[in-house]
Amino acid sequence: MQTSPLLETLMEALRCLPGVGPKSAQRMAFQLLQRDRSGGMRLAQALTRAMSEIGHCADCRTFTEQDICTICANPRRQQNGQICVVESPADIHAIEQTGQFAGRYFVLMGHLSPMDGIGPGDIGLDRLEQRLEKESVTEVILATNPTVEGDATANYIAEMCGQYGVVASRIAHGVPVGGELEMVDGTTLSHSLAGRHVIKF
């Protein structure tokens, strides 16, 4: 079936989003054109502004339209002395929602992967090392993903922290709250057993 070249271009552009295949892209395009043209215009304007104006924080590398993001610019966060290392800006959002962390962050934008040619310089570890050297950092919390690459990245950073006398800790991994043991995979259960703690009364 022949369709408008502009419509084809729109559907192809929508497919750059994660999890969006040809059918989903078609539904989105038709929805915008049939029922929500004003929403489509707002989306186009927001995308144009975001793509041209959002960059990276000079300190932590998260997304921001300022030179320094609001978290890094917060004096109380600066005095905290803790840096939480994460793989992506989305991880910051997840941790912030817990309300349990009051320090600053460092975003790797990925993880070490020698097989893919991704080394320390590609994930900003030179910048992190500068922060360890110049700032009063008391602890680096390693919140990389619980994968082989995430663990390797955490170990590399922990070794780097040791050179500057900075404590490096790894977030706990294990059984999710409300989960049933029989449904948990063996690797996760192993981590849970290894990371057990004493119950104090």
Swiss-Prot record:
One of its GO terms (biological process) is DNA repair. One of its GO terms (molecular function) is zinc ion binding. The keyword Zinc-finger applies. SUPFAM superfamilies: Recombination protein RecR. The keyword Phosphoprotein does not apply. It holds the Pfam family RecR_ZnF. Keywords: DNA damage, DNA recombination, DNA repair, Metal-binding, Zinc, Zinc-finger. SMART domains: TOPRIM (SM00493). Belongs to the RecR family. NCBIfam families: recR. May play a role in DNA repair. It seems to be involved in an RecBC-independent recombinational process of DNA repair. It may act with RecF and RecO. This is Recombination protein RecR. It comes from Serratia proteamaculans (strain 568).
